[in-house]
Amino acid sequence: MANYYTDIPELKFHLNNPIMKRICELKERNYRDKDEFDYAPLDFEDAVDSYDKVLEITGEITGEIIAANAEGVDEEGPHCANGRVEYASGTKQNLDAMVKAGLNGMTMPRKFGGLNFPITPYTMCAEIVAAADAGFGNIWSLQDCIETLYEFGNADQHSRFIPRVCQGETMSMDLTEPDAGSDLQSVMLKATYSEKDGCWLLNGVKRFITNGDADIHLVLARSEEGTRDGRGLSMFIYDKRQGGVNVRRIENKLGIHGSPTCELVYKNAKAELCGDRKLGLIKYVMALMNGARLGIAAQSVGLSQAAYNEGLAYAKDRKQFGKAIIEFPAVYDMLAIMKGKLDAGRALLYQTARYVDIYKALDDIARERKLTPEERQEQKKYAKLADSFTPLAKGMNSEYANQNAYDCIQIHGGSGFMMEYACQRIYRDARITSIYEGTTQLQTVAAIRYVTNGSYIATIREFETIPCSPEMEPLMSRLKKMANKFEASTNAVKEAQDQELLDFTARRLMEMAADIIMCHLLIQDASKNPELFAKSAHVYLNYAEAEVEKHAGFIENFDKEDLAFYKK
């Protein structure tokens, strides 16, 4: 049977990135748990070996159970009866296997029953699971909501909720409402404090809630009477054991059928405040969403990998005109670009995850003791890098998942349009990735300030100073010219001093920055392991160079007066 970890050597390469040593030192607090927990690592090598073993177990479960159940789960789906969700039979089997393997609460401290894993190896597990079944990946990976409760909840909440998640209970984040989608400041679910009950009571409706009948919910609700903006919103914890929330219906979706997307009705549902009042949206949901966006980036890479695998296997097997179709330039061109996008997107994903790991670990240490000046500087640096890279990782990988799924079907030809092949499920599942947890357009809104304030170009110029192998030098020379075009395009838009023009060109500028950054990451990877990455470095740079040229040409030739032609 396939192992979704060991079959992909690129994952082990990213696990062994040199930055992991610093991440492990911070996460393990210099390996202080070794005297208290027999499964805690003794040193860096022991920690990475532990991550590797858990990833191998995840890959085995994914290959033997989750992938095997994927088609059946897609067809059966979950059901709603008497206000409750019943998972598909295959989903129950998947969850049971993951719980028995101890793959829940992975990033939580060991004192709560977690594995104390950094974000990076956990994200690899999320990618692996999504490659087999993106719908199940949603249910399982929502465990990362516990990060927000851990970060902002109190000690009592930690002791009551975190061990339950580590033991396999599920989570959801209840944000969206019928009239509050991307515009979350419009949330109107009402939270009223009851002196009689000594808790908050929630009333209203939530919509499009992934895994909406979860055991533990993080809920965004309006706690401040008379407010209508984000400052009136707080974050609450709802425990299903308390009752008061019913599933009105499960949405009939295009894809991710295994994941129940629910409409929820709150009727005096007892809940407790998480953190401080009024900070629900402006602080806690922003942290929650950044974690979710990294998760969707991982899901997208998993889907890209699945699409590439299916396309490659079919192209090798299918014969036309006396030879396998993979031998035709039109087909091997598509496959090479699919692999280039996959490798580039994965490099961006794990670079982002490593940035998140360092600043999150330092944040956690700061709750125990005062950081040194050097640590504060390190925390600030990596928090900024994580904030700037997250919208790129989510935005680009979700678009690439869709593009790779599209090309996978194209490689299959007429067979790809039939329901018998997995490519149709991958295509349907991929479509949501560029929509939920913030559309690509909203990722552009998040990213554009890092274009205009010079963060991306500064990172790119820093990457230019990193030595590369002699074989990669010609690519680096071309890449520097691409960066010059990006910088010139950015300056041209900024000098126009027109906000509407900036908003209009933002997507192009974001993609230019992302393409150049991903090329740098691939060149760095190919310099260390040419066997794995040299081909993709060449293919992706050719692709990205044309994309940057296209966007630069558009911006150079565009007159802001032409905006009128685009408006209805």
Identify the role of each PLM range:
Residues 2-5, 9-10, 17-19, 256, ...:
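Alpha-helix capping/hinge segments and adjacent helical runs
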Residues 241-244, 248, 260-292, 309-326, ...:
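A glycine-rich, basic-preceded beta-loop-alpha segment at the flavin cofactor/substrate interface
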Residues 1-81, 85:
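Extended, charge-enriched "interface" segments that sit outside catalytic cores
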Residues 59-60, 90-163, 167, 210-212, ...:
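Internal helix-loop-helix
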Residues 154-160, 439, 445-487:
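A structural-propensity feature for long, helix-poor, extended segments
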Residues 454, 466-568:
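C-terminal amphipathic alpha-helical interaction region
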Residues 199, 203-245:
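A short core secondary-structure module
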Residues 343-394, 490-504, 523-531:
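C-terminal helix-coil-helix/basic helical segment that borders enzyme active sites and/or dimer interfaces
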